[in-house]
């Protein structure tokens, strides 16, 4: 699909227009000039004064037209004024595409990853729920159903973490272990098949211990508390029980006041990595929150996406984990996996019912740019928009019926049906780390391979991103440098605290 756009001369608007086009068409190119033929042409005209911006638009040759005006407030910065212009253009453009295609976008012009962050911001500024909801509807064209979902999640987050707006003086820590038994077809996380990598794993773990020691030392010196620790990857349980033991021992030795950290989670996503020895190690350090991710309860699907475990193994390892004291288990399901439709997804839900994990994350398949699945899209047959929407409706109904509540939400580019990923839990079993990472309310220090840090200014909320290299070889060569860089950022963020000591 090729759409020609007339009347837009600011390159900064190209990406938002492309993101909205992607909501309607899987393969879509936008052209801003030239004589190449296009499937259709959208003409946009912008009229701007000091007080307001008006955008008019039409799908040429169809009679479909739209116009919208937004006013600038007197105290707006240049950046805020540009955002107002961008949103006005997006408003008109979305309505033109909805009328032209007959497809309704329930998230309106929102294409960002964190919709609930927008609602948190409005409520924090002193707006009532009613005012905030009215603005989301009027300015962003978000439908009531999605606004209600956002509000339910915000309420649940504030119940789970009553001091959510005050945790900026603490940090959370993400520890990335980049190894897996095999790499899944949809995955773009740092994940390297662990077989035959013994030397590289050993070098990586040496660097990881170093990072933990230095970061922990700094946190202790400056009296900065840790809210949560999350071991992700990869699959952190891919390493041996002995390596896990040494790693958690380092965690207890290096980080401040570990026994009072609110939550420690270890992803054990691949059931084929879970053993009695590894569960005993988790027990030793009082870690009882893990993830075991079936993704699907169809063996054919697991084979197709490169997961070398069976449905039976998932169930067996779930029960083994329960027997060894794992009291807070999360499981993931993915809507829209290759070859799966409503029937297969309902089967996965009925299998989940037999286990009743404390939390269930329902992902919608996303075609991530660097994944094997995206590179070879022709090999993977996936469900259409309507069927994917039906599966999401089934997930919403099933979770409600079984006492689960939504507590976090995020969206991705190129996600099937422009839907969302929702984390559900039984009340009181929410993952605090997931809330922290989604709502961006505190600094998160990323340690290990591919680990992304977010340094959040405690006064302005400005976010500075910093990432460790994704591949173990690069990490092993320069982990000292990356540790030093993170400590510099921490010193900037906690400058006032630093000066007091």
UniProtKB/Swiss-Prot annotation:
One Gene Ontology term, aspect cellular component: cytoplasm
Keyword Protease: no
UniProt binding sites for S-adenosyl-L-methionine 1: 174, 233, 267
GO terms under biological process: porphyrin-containing compound biosynthetic process; protoporphyrinogen IX biosynthetic process
Pfam family, any one: Radical_SAM
Enzymatic class: oxidoreductase
Gene3D superfamilies for the chain: tm_1862 like domain (3.80.30.20)
Induction: Induced under anaerobic conditions and by hydrogen peroxide stress. It is also dependent on induction by ResDE, Fnr and ArfM.
Consequence of gene loss (knockout): Cells lacking this gene accumulate coproporphyrin-III only under anaerobic conditions, however no obvious respiratory growth phenotype is observed under anaerobic conditions. The hemN hemZ double mutant do not abolish aerobic and anaerobic respiratory growth, however a reduction of growth is observed.
UniProt miscellaneous comment: HemZ is able to complement a S.typhimurium hemF hemN double mutant under aerobic and anaerobic conditions, however under anaerobic growth conditions, the double mutant complemented with hemZ grows significantly faster.
Binding site for S-adenosyl-L-methionine 2: 186, 234-235, 295, 307, 332
EC number(s) reported in the record: 1.3.99.-
Function, in words: Involved in the biosynthesis of porphyrin-containing compound.
Record family assignment: Belongs to the anaerobic coproporphyrinogen-III oxidase family. HemZ subfamily.
Single GO term (MF): 4 iron, 4 sulfur cluster binding
Cofactor mode of binding and number, as noted: Binds 1 [4Fe-4S] cluster. The cluster is coordinated with 3 cysteines and an exchangeable S-adenosyl-L-methionine.
InterPro entries (alphabetical): Coproporphyrinogen-III_oxidase, Elp3/MiaA/NifB-like_rSAM, HemZ, rSAM, rSAM_horseshoe
Protein name, entry field: Oxygen-independent coproporphyrinogen-III oxidase-like protein HemZ
Residues that hold [4Fe-4S] cluster according to the record: 180, 184, 187
Entry superkingdom: Bacteria
The entry's keywords: 4Fe-4S, Iron, Iron-sulfur, Metal-binding, Oxidoreductase, Porphyrin biosynthesis, S-adenosyl-L-methionine
Cofactor(s) needed for function: [4Fe-4S] cluster
Pathway: Porphyrin-containing compound metabolism; protoporphyrin-IX biosynthesis
């Amino acid at each position: 699909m090729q759409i020609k756009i007339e009347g837009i001369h600011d390159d900064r608007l190209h990406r938002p227009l492309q993101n909205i086009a992607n909501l309607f068409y899987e393969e879509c190119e936008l052209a801003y000039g030239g004589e190449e033929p296009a499937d259709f042409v959208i003409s946009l005209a912008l009229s701007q004064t000091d007080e307001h911006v008006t955008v008019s638009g039409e799908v040429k040759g169809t009679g479909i037209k739209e116009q919208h005006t937004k006013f600038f407030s007197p105290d707006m910065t240049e950046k805020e004024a540009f955002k107002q212009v961008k949103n006005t253009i997006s408003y008109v453009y979305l309505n033109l595409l909805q009328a032209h295609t007959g497809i309704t976008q329930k998230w309106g012009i929102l294409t960002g990853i964190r919709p609930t962050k927008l609602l948190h911001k409005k409520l924090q500024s002193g707006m009532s729920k009613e005012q905030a909801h009215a603005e989301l509807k009027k300015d962003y064209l978000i439908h009531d159903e999605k606004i209600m979902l956002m509000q339910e999640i915000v309420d649940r987050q504030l119940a789970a973490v009553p001091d959510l707006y005050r945790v900026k003086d603490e940090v959370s820590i993400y520890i990335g272990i980049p190894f897996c038994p095999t790499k899944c077809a949809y995955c773009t996380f740092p994940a390297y098949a662990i077989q035959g990598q013994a030397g590289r794993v050993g070098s990586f773990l040496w660097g990881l211990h170093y990072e933990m020691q230095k970061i922990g030392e700094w946190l202790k010196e400056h009296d900065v508390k840790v809210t949560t620790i999350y071991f992700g990857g990869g699959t952190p349980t891919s390493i041996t029980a002995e390596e896990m033991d040494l790693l958690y021992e380092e965690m207890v030795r290096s980080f401040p006041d570990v026994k009072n950290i609110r939550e420690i989670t270890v992803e054990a996503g691949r059931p084929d990595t879970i053993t009695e020895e590894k569960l005993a190690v988790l027990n030793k350090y009082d870690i009882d929150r893990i993830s075991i991710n079936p993704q699907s309860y169809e063996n054919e699907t697991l084979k197709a996406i490169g997961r070398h475990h069976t449905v039976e193994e998932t169930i067996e390892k779930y029960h083994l984990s329960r027997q060894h004291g794992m009291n807070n288990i999360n499981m993931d399901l993915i809507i829209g996996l290759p070859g799966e439709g409503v029937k297969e997804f309902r089967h996965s839900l009925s299998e989940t019912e037999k286990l009743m994990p404390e939390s269930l994350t329902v992902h919608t398949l996303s075609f991530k740019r660097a994944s094997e699945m995206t590179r070879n899209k022709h090999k993977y047959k996936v469900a259409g928009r309507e069927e994917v929407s039906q599966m999401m409706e089934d997930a919403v109904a099933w979770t409600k019926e079984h006492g689960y509540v939504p507590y976090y939400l995020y969206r991705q580019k190129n996600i099937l049906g422009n839907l969302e990923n929702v984390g559900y839990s039984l009340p009181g079993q929410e993952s605090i780390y997931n809330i922290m990472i989604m709502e961006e309310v505190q600094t998160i220090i990323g340690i290990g391979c591919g680990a992304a840090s977010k340094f959040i200014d405690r006064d302005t909320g400005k976010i500075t991103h910093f990432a460790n290299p994704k591949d173990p070889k690069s990490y092993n060569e320069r982990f000292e440098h990356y540790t030093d860089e993170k400590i510099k950022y921490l010193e900037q963020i906690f400058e006032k605290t630093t000066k007091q000591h």
